[in-house]
């Protein structure tokens, strides 16, 4: 049986050996080049392949059409993946008639994603295992073919658990590979309601937060002990690594992070105390705890900190252009809720952010981005993170003012992007679900879906292509000049302060605000082309939480990523949105102040939006990148969002002239 193998690490080596022992013919092996910044304690797949006389490759992008074609020419019967670090696209998986199978180091559906070995230790699990599962488009989600459980002992650390997993993997493959070869396997679908997903870990994720319980910190030490980079802390600005530890149920009133004693080296935690058994100061040598205390100059009562003292006091500076807009003002509120952000904002108005103007960590200037270029360049240079949220994003303007849309949405934003490149600043750029255009995929996927728009004589697409071209420019700057970026694509976010009723009066608003205006004024709700177009509506609170996590960027997992932020469960047509809104309106305590409902009216899109408009029938996001990078999923039901949005706008209406 011919196979193509994707493999890396010790698991890759043992997987290859198991395939050969089971009589598989390996046509080619795809692996990775070693990362010079990573301690290579594991076997080399490339070396093993060379010794076995098997062609081996390490392309940067195995999913490139050229590599897909080369793999197709190998005509594999089956494909195997053993700890290959990149997602293998469906175009490759479909090449093998018998399917594709992946070896994963956890008891799926638990601990999907990256670094399950480390995560189970971080989380204090007592059991894990290995799973062989069928590969599908979604990572680690295919049916389970075989699974083997192993116990995690209290004294297990990352390397001992790694050895246990390797031993279990050998057993599992020896038992299962012959069955796959003969087409005699039983597959069990994963239970999605039990699934958990974790992202990649970096060395910076392993800092010791002393306010946490000692048991939690001890688990962190176990999870990243040598040969992993190690858990760490600071004495002032001096970094040190903790290689091994013990939990002490020490009842102390000392502040977390305080040194209780130096021999043994005991540190007060949020609950109990942690004994540092062995550690290392800076890039020095490993030593036992009391010697480490002496080297670091620690005495009883000394304080440790989770980050260097010189950086602990500095807040992250976030520049929000368009801070008074729907996303900008809600994001400002979320950032100021924390104590480690300083927000700088620019906009042409301040009505939505007036509640922040006296906040000590909020700095606002009223101005236009097309005029205040010097202020913007200075603040891009000054700040750490830049969010250029200024854009014309209302559909009627795409046909009414296409050149103004291009000038503001593309030209002005391109200038800001170039400032970020010039000063090497991180940019979080608001792409849009509009870039997918008339894509026919069931779920719009950031990495696979085609971006399809209409002909040039349909100016409705100028917003979509302006945003798409900026996405491509940012991506190119990231590839060629090292720009640190994340692109996020909101899918129909809605909530309080989405546009305003005055904007709706001239047609320059999003759907729900326009519908609320119709109810307030007693005018018919207009259903464009029947209102059958479906959208996935996302509560602003869910959207902002995802955006906040992008800004936090735990483990740098968001760098270079495109992330859809939407709620695929909240799919409804515009007609259904109108009906839900009407039902909420009729039950509202202020209902008697407003005119009778004037009904629904079907109108043609050309009469409403003007010549050159095209609509999209459906727009449903894949949110796998949001799961993977942010550990995020939307939680708020569409009805709750409708109720709160309606209530907000009704309470902004001057009721003095309304009937009672």
UniProtKB/Swiss-Prot annotation:
Q: Which GO terms describe its molecular function?
A: identical protein binding; NAD+ binding; UDP-4-amino-4-deoxy-L-arabinose formyltransferase activity; UDP-glucuronate decarboxylase activity; UDP-glucuronate dehydrogenase activity
Q: Which residues bind NAD(+)?
A: 347, 368-369
Reported impact of residue 104 to A? 25-fold lower formyltransferase activity
Entry's EC annotation: 2.1.2.13, 1.1.1.305
Q: Report the outcome of residue 433 to A.
A: 40-fold lower specific activity
**A Pfam family name for this chain?**
Formyl_trans_C
Q: Where is the active site?
A: 104 (proton donor), 434 (proton acceptor), 619 (proton donor)
GO BP field: lipid A biosynthetic process; lipopolysaccharide biosynthetic process; response to antibiotic; UDP-4-deoxy-4-formamido-beta-L-arabinopyranose biosynthetic process; UDP-D-xylose biosynthetic process
Record region (Dehydrogenase ArnADH): 314-660
Please list the residues that bind UDP-alpha-D-glucuronate: 393, 398, 432-433, 460, 492, 526-535, 613
List the protein's name: Bifunctional polymyxin resistance protein ArnA
**What gene name is given for the protein in this entry?**
arnA
């Amino acid at each position: 049986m011919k196979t193509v193998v994707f493999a890396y690490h010790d698991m890759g080596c043992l997987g290859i050996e198991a395939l050969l022992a089971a009589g598989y013919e390996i046509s080619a092996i795809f692996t990775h080049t070693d990362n010079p910044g990573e301690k290579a304690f594991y076997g080399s797949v490339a070396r093993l392949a060379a010794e076995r006389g098997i062609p081996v490759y390490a392309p940067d992008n195995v999913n490139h059409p050229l590599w897909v074609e080369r793999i197709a020419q190998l005509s594999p019967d089956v494909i195997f993946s053993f700890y290959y670090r990149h997602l293998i696209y469906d175009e490759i998986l479909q090449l093998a008639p018998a399917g594709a199978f992946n070896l994963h180091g956890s008891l799926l559906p638990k601990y999907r994603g990256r670094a399950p070995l480390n995560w189970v230790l971080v989380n204090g699990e007592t059991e894990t295992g290995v799973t062989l599962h069928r590969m599908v488009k979604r990572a680690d989600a295919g049916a389970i073919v075989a699974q083997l459980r192993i116990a995690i002992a209290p004294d297990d650390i990352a390397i001992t658990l790694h050895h246990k997993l390797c031993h279990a993997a050998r057993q599992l493959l020896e038992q299962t590979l012959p069955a796959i070869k003969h087409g005699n396997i039983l597959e069990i679908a994963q239970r999605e309601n039990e699934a958990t997903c974790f992202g990649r870990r970096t060395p910076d994720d392993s800092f010791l937060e002393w306010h946490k319980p000692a048991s939690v910190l001890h688990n962190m030490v176990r999870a990243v002990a040598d040969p992993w980079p190690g858990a760490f802390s600071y004495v002032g600005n001096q970094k040190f690594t903790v290689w091994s530890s013990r939990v002490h149920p020490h009842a102390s009133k000392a502040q977390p992070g305080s040194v209780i004693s130096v021999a043994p080296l005991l540190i007060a935690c949020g609950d109990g105390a942690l004994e540092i058994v062995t550690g290392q100061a800076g890039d020095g040598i490993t030593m036992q705890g009391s010697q480490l205390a002496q080297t670091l100059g620690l005495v009883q009562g000394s304080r440790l900190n989770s980050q260097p003292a010189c950086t602990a006091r500095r807040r992250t500076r976030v520049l929000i252009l368009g801070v008074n807009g729907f996303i900008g003002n809600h994001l400002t509120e979320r950032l100021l809720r924390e104590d480690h952000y300083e927000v700088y904002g620019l906009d042409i108005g301040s009505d939505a952010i007036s509640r922040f103007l006296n906040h000590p960590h909020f700095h606002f200037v009223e101005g236009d981005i097309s005029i205040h270029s010097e202020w913007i360049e200075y603040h891009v240079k000054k700040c750490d993170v830049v969010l250029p949220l200024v854009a014309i994003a209302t559909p009627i303007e795409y046909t009414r003012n296409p050149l103004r849309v291009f000038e503001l949405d593309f030209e002005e934003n391109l200038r800001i992007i170039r400032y970020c490149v010039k000063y090497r600043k991180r940019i979080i750029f608001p792409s849009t679900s509009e870039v997918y255009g008339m894509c026919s995929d069931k779920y719009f996927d950031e990495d696979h879906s085609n971006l399809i728009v209409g002909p040039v004589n349909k100016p409705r697409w100028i917003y979509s292509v302006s945003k798409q071209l900026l996405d491509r420019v940012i991506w190119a700057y990231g590839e060629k000049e090292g720009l640190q970026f994340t692109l996020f694509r909101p899918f129909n976010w809605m909530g309080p302060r989405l546009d305003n009723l005055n904007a709706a009066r001239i047609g320059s608003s999003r759907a729900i605000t326009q519908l609320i205006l119709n109810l307030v004024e007693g005018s018919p709700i207009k259903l464009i082309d029947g209102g059958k177009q479906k959208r996935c509506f996302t509560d602003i609170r869910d959207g902002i939480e995802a955006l906040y996590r992008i800004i936090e960027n735990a483990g740098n997992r968001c760098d270079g990523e495109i992330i859809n932020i939407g709620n695929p469960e909240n799919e409804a047509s515009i007609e259904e949105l109108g009906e839900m809104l009407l039902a909420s309106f009729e039950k509202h305590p202020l209902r008697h102040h407003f005119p009778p409902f004037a009904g629904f009216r079907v109108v043609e899109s050309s009469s409403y939006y003007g010549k050159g408009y095209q609509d999209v029938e459906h727009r449903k996001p894949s949110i796998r990148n949001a799961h993977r990078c942010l550990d995020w999923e939307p939680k708020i039901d569409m009805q709750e969002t409708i109720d709160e949005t309606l209530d907000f706008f009704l309470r902004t209406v001057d009721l003095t002239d309304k009937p009672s």
